[in-house]
Swiss-Prot record:
Chief place where the protein resides: nucleus
UniProt record, GO biological process: maturation of SSU-rRNA; ribosomal small subunit biogenesis; rRNA processing
The name this protein goes by in its record: U3 small nucleolar ribonucleoprotein protein IMP4
GO CC terms in record: 90S preribosome; Mpp10 complex; nucleolus; nucleoplasm; small-subunit processome
Compartment(s) of residence: Nucleus, Nucleolus
Length: 290
């Protein structure tokens, strides 16, 4: 069993490396194509690459849609997307406060097929191993600082990725006036202003936490709105009336900011870092990554 998992992991990493290499090559060819169309000089590293320019003329027959498909290197969800519903476990750090436990309950209600697990004395490798054996697709771990939720980690099984978000301005359901009852039907999802490749990667991670398929009778809406790399999460219910549509917020309400994306699972500290927020760079606060 362990040998098979190790072999599958090696095969997956090799396939992922090949796809990333092809994606980088395709991006370089796209830069050459744009430079030729606009009459701009090529960057020095591309101008000196003779093999890249030699093969460029054979790429002119590629359609834009095919080029876009070549850049889609994220196949972690391909095996189960739209075929089976996600199975999610929500847990916390050790010895959680009352407020963090309450927030974990509300996050559990946010996802239709989620189960909340008391952390107890579980160490992370044993917890991940138990999730894999039980057929869990995603693990959500919440952390806090002095009773205030500070981070949310999403790890997909069996091979990753693992996305870590910082939490800001957390408002729980019981802090919202007239929040109403929590609906547990499959929600409609709204993803707003995710324009970059990294943004679409984050959308792929978040949307696969929910069930696929039509939701005609659902009156529940969850919104993920990107504003300056801060993802605002809001949950509403709506009711159709004679005068139109009335909406009400049911919570919880918080902002997330991505600060690290790894290719492996949560217990794998040696996994490759796909993206990491580097605040010490001068342009870190001026550039939008999502």
């Amino acid at each position: 069993m362990l040998r098979r998992q190790a072999r599958e992991r090696r095969e997956y990493l090799y396939r992922k490396a090949q796809e990333l290499q092809d994606s980088q090559l395709q991006q370089k060819r796209q830069i050459i194509k744009q430079a030729l169309a606009q009459g701009k000089p090529l960057p020095k590293e591309l101008a000196e690459d003779e093999s890249l320019q030699k093969d460029f003329r054979y790429d002119q027959s590629l359609k834009e849609s095919e080029e876009a498909d070549d850049l889609q290197v994220d196949d972690e969800y391909a095996a189960t997307s739209g075929i089976m519903d996600p199975r999610i476990i929500v847990t916390t750090s050790r010895d959680p406060s009352t407020r963090l436990s309450q927030f974990a309950k509300e996050i559990k209600l946010l996802f239709p097929n989620a189960v909340r697990l008391n952390r107890g004395n579980y160490v992370m490798p044993n917890l991940v191993d138990a999730c894999k054996k039980s057929g869990t697709t995603d693990l959500v771990v919440l952390h806090e600082h002095r009773g205030v939720p500070t981070s949310l980690t999403i790890s997909h099984f069996p091979h990753g990725p693992t996305a870590q978000f910082s939490l800001h301005n957390v408002v729980m359901r019981h802090d919202i006036i007239n929040a109403g009852n929590q609906s547990e039907v499959n929600p409609h999802l709204i993803f707003d202003n995710f324009t970059t490749a990294l943004g679409k990667r984050v959308v792929c991670i978040l949307k696969h936490l929910f069930n696929a398929g039509p939701k005609k009778d659902s009156e529940r809406v969850i919104t993920f709105a990107n504003r300056g790399d801060f993802i605002s999460v809001r949950q509403h219910v709506y009711v159709r009336t004679r005068e139109g549509v009335e909406i009400a917020e049911v919570g919880p309400r918080f902002e997330m900011r991505l600060f690290e994306l790894r290719l492996g699972t949560l217990e794998n500290k040696d996994a490759d870092v796909e993206w990491q927020l580097r605040r010490f760079i001068r342009t870190a606060n001026k550039k939008d990554y999502l």
